[in-house]
């Protein structure tokens, strides 16, 4: 199957085949149908990759590629994952059904615009008609970018990047099919429509958030996370925890504004809703029961399997509801990595793993947001395992939930706040400046922020426990 034919088939499978999701000639028609007396949204959507979960399912992906009619596949990974059973099984699966493939293994942990551009250039260099990502969030996000821009070769890099740095345009061509095989219990990227990268010149991170970049298939194999190093398990687990907490406490979808003029411009991050709530709560329950076990005993197969399940579940939750302050404040932290050395990660550069940067401000963030929706913070604390009465006051709820978060950090012995990663009080202005470009525009945050609030949240995060 040629790349152009594959795009054509995907286009026919897209929104235009559904009358309600087809573009309308009048951009205000949908809003008029529901009246003009309300500026917030009135609907939510469930967007998710097909998910296949089970021990050994990596060996099935060759059949999936063959069933797509694909002729030339690009297999993307990083140099560490390339030596794992996950990658070897992925290769074996393709060889079993004689799929032609090539390998790109130059993915950067915590990808940058430059590293993604390198993958994009490779993807454009030959007529690949399908993509497979085997790795953690960095690999999956890089593969999303490679597949998207290879499917839209005339686009500039910032065309699809979200504001304030990019244009957030809709691509002309649908993305060629991507199969994601996660090797960490944390990213959730295998089910989501987002890809994150670093923009060093802005000392911050940004992302692409488009429904079309969600993987065609997520192949979630517990065998692929059994060899996760200790700190990878911790930091990817922190990401799961914050995905679930942020999506569950996000502003409800029907309080988010502005109301979209057309369904195809409804944002990927819609706000909390009844479907995302189910996935986020279940992820929190699993985390409360299995997170510590999965770290303290790497041979605990049940715990690692459950945390991988929580990762995908939280991915479905935040992939539709969204994330807010923890992630928004994390991007300048990881982008401006000081003298932090992350054990169990490549040591060729200063690195603050994404999950650690997200967790660093979590205590301050949820202390700040509790008053906006105390009932949700209460349920979150209870679901994580706290014995807290339903009639608890806001202060008790906030203290209980935040003590749970501190407990994870202390028990795992991670760097204690920003100071533990090499930042000082004098760095707060730089962090605040970088965050102020995007954090105040996070419309699903349960409480609005400004520059002063952002600065105070960073200050409270200098030391956490």
UniProtKB/Swiss-Prot annotation:
Main enzyme class: oxidoreductase
Entry keyword annotation includes Lipoprotein: no
EC code(s) of this entry: 1.1.99.24
Keyword field: Mitochondrion, Oxidoreductase, Transit peptide
Chaperone listed as a keyword: no
Membrane spanning residue stretches: none
Catalytic reactions of this protein: (S)-3-hydroxybutanoate + 2-oxoglutarate = (R)-2-hydroxyglutarate + acetoacetate; 4-hydroxybutanoate + 2-oxoglutarate = (R)-2-hydroxyglutarate + succinate semialdehyde
GO biological process terms held by the UniProt record: glutamate catabolic process via 2-hydroxyglutarate
UniProt-recorded Gene Ontology molecular function terms: alcohol dehydrogenase (NAD+) activity; hydroxyacid-oxoacid transhydrogenase activity; metal ion binding
Localization, UniProt: Mitochondrion
Main location: mitochondrion
GO CC term, one of those recorded: mitochondrion
Pfam families recorded: ADH_Fe_C, Fe-ADH
Functional summary from the UniProt entry: Catalyzes the cofactor-independent reversible oxidation of gamma-hydroxybutyrate (GHB) to succinic semialdehyde (SSA) coupled to reduction of 2-ketoglutarate (2-KG) to D-2-hydroxyglutarate (D-2-HG). L-3-hydroxybutyrate (L-3-OHB) is also a substrate for HOT when using 2-KG as hydrogen acceptor, resulting in the formation of D-2-HG.
Recorded family membership: Belongs to the iron-containing alcohol dehydrogenase family. Hydroxyacid-oxoacid transhydrogenase subfamily.
Protein name, per record: Hydroxyacid-oxoacid transhydrogenase, mitochondrial
Species of provenance: Caenorhabditis briggsae
Native organism taxonomy: Eukaryota, Metazoa, Ecdysozoa, Nematoda, Chromadorea
């Amino acid at each position: 199957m040629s790349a152009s034919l594959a795009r054509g088939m995907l286009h026919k499978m897209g929104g235009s085949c559904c009358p309600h999701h087809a573009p309308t000639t009048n951009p205000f028609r949908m809003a008029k149908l529901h009246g003009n007396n309300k500026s917030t949204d009135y609907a939510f959507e469930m967007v998710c990759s097909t998910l296949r979960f089970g021990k050994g399912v990596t060996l099935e992906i060759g059949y999936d590629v063959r069933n797509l009619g694909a002729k030339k596949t690009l297999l993307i990974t990083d140099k560490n994952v390339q030596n794992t059973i996950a990658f070897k099984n992925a290769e074996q699966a393709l060889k079993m059904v004689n799929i032609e493939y090539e390998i790109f293994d130059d993915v950067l942990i915590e990808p940058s615009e430059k590293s993604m551009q390198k993958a994009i250039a490779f993807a454009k260099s030959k007529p690949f008609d399908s993509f497979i990502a085997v790795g953690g969030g960095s690999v999956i996000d890089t593969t999303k970018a490679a597949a998207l821009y290879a499917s839209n070769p005339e686009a500039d890099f910032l065309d699809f990047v979200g504001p304030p740095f990019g244009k957030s345009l809709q691509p002309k061509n649908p993305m060629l099919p991507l199969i994601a095989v996660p090797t960490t219990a944390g990213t959730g990227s295998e089910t989501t429509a987002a890809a994150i990268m670093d923009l060093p010149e802005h000392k911050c991170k940004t992302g692409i958030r488009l429904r079309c970049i969600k993987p065609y298939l997520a192949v979630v194999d517990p065998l692929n996370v059994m060899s996760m190093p200790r700190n990878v398990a911790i930091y990817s687990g922190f990401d799961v925890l914050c995905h679930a907490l942020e999506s569950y406490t996000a502003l409800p979808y029907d309080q988010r504004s502005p109301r979209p003029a057309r369904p195809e411009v409804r944002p990927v991050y819609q706000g909390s809703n009844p479907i995302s709530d189910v996935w986020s709560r279940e992820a929190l329950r699993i985390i409360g029961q299995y997170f510590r076990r999965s770290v303290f005993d790497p041979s605990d197969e049940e715990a690692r399997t459950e945390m991988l399940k929580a990762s995908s579940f939280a991915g479905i939750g935040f992939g539709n509801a969204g994330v807010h302050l923890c992630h928004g404040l994390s991007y300048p932290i990881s982008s401006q990595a000081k003298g932090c050395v992350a054990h169990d990660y490549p040591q060729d550069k200063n690195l603050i793993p994404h999950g650690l940067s997200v967790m660093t401000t979590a205590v301050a963030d949820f202390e700040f947001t509790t008053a906006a929706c105390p009932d949700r913070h209460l349920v979150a604390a209870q679901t994580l395992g706290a014995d807290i009465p339903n009639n608890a006051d806001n202060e008790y709820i906030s203290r209980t939930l935040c003590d749970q978060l501190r407990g994870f950090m202390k028990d795992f012995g991670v760097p204690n706040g920003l100071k533990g990663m090499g930042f000082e009080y004098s760095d707060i202005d730089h962090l605040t400046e970088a965050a102020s470009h995007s954090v105040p525009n996070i419309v699903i945050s349960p409480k609005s922020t400004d520059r002063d609030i952002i600065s105070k949240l960073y200050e409270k995060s200098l030391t956490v426990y």
